[in-house]
């Protein structure tokens, strides 16, 4: 007769089975199909030619393609700069909202609003703001002659949209620190920097790390805000990896090479996800050690 623990274990797998099957259908099968396509010269256009296996040729071409490498460098720049600024602004705003002042709750709601907006709405709003004819910041748009400025405009929209996520996670961590600790530190003559280093930073480092890794993954695969605002232009200056894969697959109809680009990008995202899991497990171990 099965023990109670084994019965519960089996029942848990039975309950999880529908979700696991759905995940396989929605994730594993398309991923396997994309992997297969990446080894072929499949074209979406009706050329009438049979599909041939080219094996690693698509990957070798991708690694030597200057346009792909430029898109990767552009994506890396977008990710690093955007996430760094979002982290800095998010922490500063969280520290502000953790203070006691009149209207704090109203300000908290206003801070969350950009994050609550759908990305498409946010992108369209910034596109209208940068319109050269009637945009509220058209003076800035007139300076977008240098192509690099367009990427910075997209980064501004992305930062405004996503820094509230960092603020929320850091603010939740700050509220777990008892006010008595800060009061006692002030009585002992500790400076604001020493209080931050001794109490604030240890409390927020875990949630901040998780927020930054999640934002890094999201920023690395940015697509929608670029599609709405710039369509990868001008002169491909805002063409990131996701947009590059989109164009290769659906604009140029090169399904085989597009799949190879997509698999390489998925591998890069997998590395970031592994980093997130590593930080999550390390934070959990620290919590267990602190409780012990």
Predicted regions and their residues:
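A structural signal for multi-pass alpha-helical bundles of membrane permease subunits
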Residues: 8-292
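Short, Lys/Arg-rich, polar N-terminal cytosolic tail immediately upstream
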Residues: 1-7
